[in-house]
Design a protein with these regions (language model features):
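Amphipathic, low-complexity, repeat-rich surface-exposed segments
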Residues: 1-143
Length: 143
């Protein structure tokens, strides 16, 4: 083989080696990026789960407190109604209790709705961030 041919083979080999090393580095970086990305996804799911757990805990406490108050209000109303002296007084007290119970129920439903709406917003925020990150990652690899 001539010196020129040997030199060409050496240059080709060096270029192939360089290209292969760059490819391996890019692949390793890609694997590292995917691993990191997946870890961040797991953390986002865990964060969302914690938010929902706290919201469920808050809602449960609210429901228990409401149930206790409703029971106490019902017992007080029953006691008050049992001491009425006339049919009209009975209907007045019964109507007042029903109105109060309904207003309390609507208020409680609003509180629970607020708890769950805030939880949904807060819990989905990390997932939305991960979706944005995934979109950005795909755009970066396409570029």
């Amino acid at each position: 083989m001539t010196k020129a041919a040997t030199k060409q083979v050496e240059e080709f080999t060096a270029e192939a080696k360089k290209t292969m090393e760059e490819g391996v580095e890019k692949m390793a970086k890609g694997v590292e990026d995917v691993t990191s990305f997946n870890q961040e996804n797991v953390e986002a799911v865990m964060t969302s789960g914690k938010v929902f757990a706290k919201a469920t805990e808050a809602a449960s406490a609210e429901i228990i407190a409401f149930s206790k108050k409703s029971y106490e209000d019902g017992m007080a109303a029953a006691k008050e109604i049992s001491s009425v002296k006339s049919v009209s007084e009975f209907f007045e007290k019964q109507t007042a209790f029903a109105k109060s119970a309904f207003e309390n129920y609507v208020s409680e439903a609003t509180k629970l709705n607020d708890i769950y709406a805030a939880a949904a917003k807060d819990a989905f925020a990390p997932m939305n961030d991960r979706f944005t990150a995934a979109t950005d990652m795909v755009k970066a690899y396409k570029a």
